[in-house]
């Protein structure tokens, strides 16, 4: 979609920034970003819901929990847990708080790819948004959580946006009915 937009508007420059939903929302509130593709956060911005995304358990191949149809949330209290973005307001932390779960954290990292590598190596289990998991689907087992946990994923943007941002917003909203379910790679 970015290349299609720039074909129509070659004079508009774009900068793509990666970060957690909370980091990107903070950039939006500080006017350091015009748009954020994030899980839902409160704040002084507009919001367009794109999808309700399931959270999934990440398991190493051959792990006993891979025999189940879903991973019970309380399994994270006893299994070796790999925490991504420790101490930050991320979806995993929100899910554990919502479920009153204290995970058995044995490893932590500030890099989601390191989380997947550690899971693949059998060091523990983790959770992530399903939309982020497609790049690893052949190397890590993804199972639903029990009870089911989801996060709203959408486009956040400022209340007062520039004409260039307005053009991008119209372009995106015109495309929304045609957006495939797996389009975005969201860190969180």
What is each model feature region?
Residues 36, 56-58, 64, 82, ...:
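Residues embedded in well-ordered beta-strands
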